[in-house]
């Protein structure tokens, strides 16, 4: 992939992902016991923003096929009327995330993250992102996003394909570059 622009993949953390939305994870989350102490509630993990302009929340399941590495990033999409959350159903598979800030798309502002199977993400309204990038296995995700009368998905092709480069600091990144 000589001459191909490279996007370095970093480990997904709440702090690094904050400009794009929320990391949905139990680690570091506010929690408290409920139901007579038999259940622990991890509370308010993401800001779901879907109700403006007659929108309503939808819950769906996406089944993602694993992508072959190297992964070519050729398009981005955004949801201008609502947020979109991805919550893995099994904590065994990693997935890659490519995002860019809301507003006019700028390829030089893209960032990439490696999510562990126990981490979900919630893209804020209007944030550019690549479609789901499962890496290790067929992976099921619960999706919370917006239903409503307006179209809610804008896609743009990239002028050239970008390649993901997985940093060694990403736990278990060996075998992904």
Curated annotation (Swiss-Prot):
Pathway: Nitrogen metabolism; (S)-allantoin degradation. GO terms for biological process: allantoin catabolic process; purine nucleobase catabolic process. Its cofactor is Ni(2+). Its EC number is 4.3.2.3. Keywords: Lyase, Purine metabolism. Homodimer. This is Ureidoglycolate lyase. The gene is allA.
């Amino acid at each position: 992939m000589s001459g191909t622009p490279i996007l370095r993949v970093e480990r997904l953390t709440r702090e690094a992902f904050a400009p794009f939305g929320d990391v949905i994870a139990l680690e570091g989350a506010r929690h408290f016991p409920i139901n007579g102490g038999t259940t622990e509630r991890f509370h308010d993990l993401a800001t779901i923003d879907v109700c403006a302009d007659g929108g309503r929340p939808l819950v769906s399941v996406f089944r993602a096929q694993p992508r072959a590495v190297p992964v070519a990033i050729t398009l981005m999409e955004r949801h201008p009327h609502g947020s979109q959350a991805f919550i893995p159903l099994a904590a065994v598979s990693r997935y890659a995330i490519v995002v860019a800030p809301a507003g006019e798309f700028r390829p030089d502002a893209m960032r990439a993250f490696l999510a562990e199977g126990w981490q979900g993400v919630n893209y804020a309204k209007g944030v550019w992102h690549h479609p789901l990038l499962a890496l290790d296995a067929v992976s099921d995700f619960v999706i919370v996003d917006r239903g409503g009368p307006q179209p809610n998905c804008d896609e743009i092709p990239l002028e050239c394909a970008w390649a993901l480069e997985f940093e060694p600091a990403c736990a278990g990144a060996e075998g992904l570059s």
